[in-house]
Amino acid sequence: MEQIYHLYITHKCGHNCPLCCNRLYDIDKLPVITVEDLKQAHTVCLTGGDPFYLLREELISIVDRLRIHYKNIQRIYIYTSGKKLWIEGAYSHWHELMQAVSGINVAPKDYGDWNRLDYLLQQPKWLEMTAQPGMSNRLYVFDDQWDTWNTISKDITLPATWQIIGRKWDKEFKTPENEHFVRLPLLY
């Protein structure tokens, strides 16, 4: 069975969501990922807080090290609210990183995140960057966000590499048997 590791790499986040699943855990007591874990991993999902709050070079370094030292890892995904995806010069800023990952999973948390996402999804270079062959991106839309998504989606056509998934706020983060929630020994 393919082993999937949700790797918590940072506490940094621009939100204070009342139902954040990270509040259910003492993050310091999560198991620390080991070399043996990484040697078994098929997929690594970088999570946190929000990995995009790290310096771009830090995030690229983590992805590069996983790719170089663990050839068995077939997929690397980054989970984000999308808040830090939009920056001035977003395409050139994130292009190298997007070439190194299998996709991004975006779960906007507030109206500002949706505005930034709306802007990005109307940028041809951004859409092209997330439409590379083999990429698999997800946009998570929570129950109370469908009206916002329906308004935004009228003006854009997402590449086939994007999947829209309805979500409910989950008070528990229970992983299936082949998935593991772990952390780095030292968080960024």
How should each PLM-predicted stretch be described?
Residues 122-188:
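Auxiliary Fe-S-binding modules of radical SAM enzymes
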Residues 1-31:
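Canonical Radical SAM [4Fe-4S] cluster-binding loop centered on the CxxxCxxC motif
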Residues 38-39, 89-116, 151-181:
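Structural recognition of alpha->loop->beta junctions
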Residues 35-39, 70, 92-99, 124-131:
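Acidic (Asp/Glu)-rich catalytic clusters
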Residues 58-68, 77:
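N-terminal active-site wall of soluble small-molecule enzyme domains
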Residues 28-35, 87-93:
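Alpha-helical scaffolding within the catalytic cores
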Residues 4-6, 43-45, 73-77, 101-105, ...:
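Structural preference for beta-strand elements that scaffold enzyme active sites
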Residues 23-28, 41-54, 70-87, 97-122:
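Core AdoMet radical
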